[in-house]
Amino acid sequence: GTFVLVDLVYYLWHRASHRVNLLWAAHIVHHQSEDYNLAVALRQAFFTPLTTLPFYIPIALLGVSPLVFLTTVALNTVYQFWIHTRLVGRLGPVEWVMNTPSHHRVHHGINPEYIDRNHAGVFIVWDRLFGTFTPEGQEPVYGTVQGHHGANAIAANLQPVADLFRLAARRGGLDAVKTLIGPPEWRPASEGGPQPVPVPNPGLRWDPHPPTPIVVYSGVWMLLASLALTIVLFAQADLPLAHQGALAFLLLWTVGAWGGLLDERPW
């Protein structure tokens, strides 16, 4: 029962994260990739724990124990890993009930007919019940409508949120509020009103070509940092909180530096 309830709440959060600008700015990093593979499943937003919290609190109020809740959320997340692939086709009757790679490819597509569809985590029945289901038809074009060109993971998480607040401040008044809580396509009348979703051009992809030495250097650095992160995770129980914070900051700085190198920025 808890598994089904958690999946329903996940659906509600996920749907809201595509229809409320502030939540979308926090979630958008998961959709920025113009490829669709298992690595996309690992492209998780910094702010997800904050945005999911208000949705999951009612489950605690129902008396579900923390252990059961955390285990259920973990299983829900693990299930969603394998559906981020183009290698698995249609799965017949399974697709009537379960979320599958085909259903989730639709969710990541920016084709106009695929925008804001198939928000399910595990059970696609939520989309069927609430009118947000669309079967896979034409080949999806992946990414975001506005596009994202950059390898800096820190900027990918923070820039959309900063841009949204700057836009709200520029519009001011009630339009500022609507900018934050309205859907992504919303525009004030002075800017032409709600904008239709453009038809994407699959030939327009971000295709960077950083110098080979930079790629090799960043790859080696990534392996070393990953090893360091693994050691920290296993040893964190024995580390003072200040040391954990310092190591976390160093790892984040490292991630930002990779992005700067691969984007060939002067700093």
Task: Kindly give the residue locations of the regions a language model identified.
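A membrane-cytosol interface segment of integral membrane proteins
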Residues: 140-189
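Hydrophobic alpha-helical transmembrane segments
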Residues: 12-21, 161-167, 194-195, 218-224, ...
